[in-house]
Amino acid sequence: MQFFESTIISIYPLYVLREKQKELQYVKEYKPAVEDVKHLRVLMFGHVGAGKSSFINSVSNVLRGRMSIPALTSSTTSDRRRGTSKTFFPLVFNDVMGLEDGNNSGIHASDITLAMKGHVKDGHKFNPIAPLTKEDYGYNPSPSLDDKVHVLVCVMSANAPQINASVLQKMKKVRETASELGIPQMAMMTHIDAACGEIEKDLKNVYRSKHLHKKMKDFSAAVGIPMNCIFPVKNYSDEIDLKDDVDFLVLSALRKMVDFGDDFVEKNLN
């Protein structure tokens, strides 16, 4: 038994490196099959402090193959990810401000709905007091398939205290709207190392942690996202160099976004 465990430990880094390289190559070579769609649009939403912007920065690090200067958090960003050759990958992340308790704080659920339908212009700054209207400059009256959201990603921090019921209700409302629009959905659970000492000690314990599994199960029940569509990730924060096991988790989630988005585009050609 001891020999078996030591063997698993010794081959784990090789497995992670191989899978990381495979997923990275897949993302790098992906191109939308439809000429009118230049990129896949991924909308990320969640509670305040969930780690949405940090994940986007982590994706930038992985695709560039080095640590990069992190982008500052804002009310919205439309960010095309770039690789080592200064070529842009066909991915755009829409990062909106976090959902908060109350009606006059955080982003409005109606604004997220407009974004999913493609009615929000890139770079528009959301107003927590007043939602976007057809008269606003940031409103796109005639969205193309390229403008619409192709994947909805709900982000939840594993280390967050209990999420307010009203925030969870907003999350469910956004999901229900996405379902009506046929937009595929998935979720990411961030800050997994801060939430579990076993994972903080060694990231390969991510799939062994009973604590994390319960967190994911509770989150699945609360917002209605299946367990097999919830991906644990660790964002880069205080590291100065890339790590294969961190990259692997980021790329696993990214690969699923590409697959889901590609499916949506193919189904909505007409």
Can you describe what each PLM-predicted range is?
Residues 2-36:
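N-terminal pre-Walker A segment at the start of P-loop NTPase domains
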Residues 43-45, 94, 188:
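Short hydrophobic segments within beta-strands
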Residues 40-64:
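Glycine-rich phosphate-binding P-loop
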Residues 148, 181, 219-227:
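A structural motif corresponding to the C-terminal end of an alpha-helix
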Residues 210, 214-225, 237-240:
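C-terminal structured domain segments
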Residues 30-36, 59-183, 191-211, 234-239, ...:
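Switch- and interface-adjacent substructures of P-loop NTPase systems
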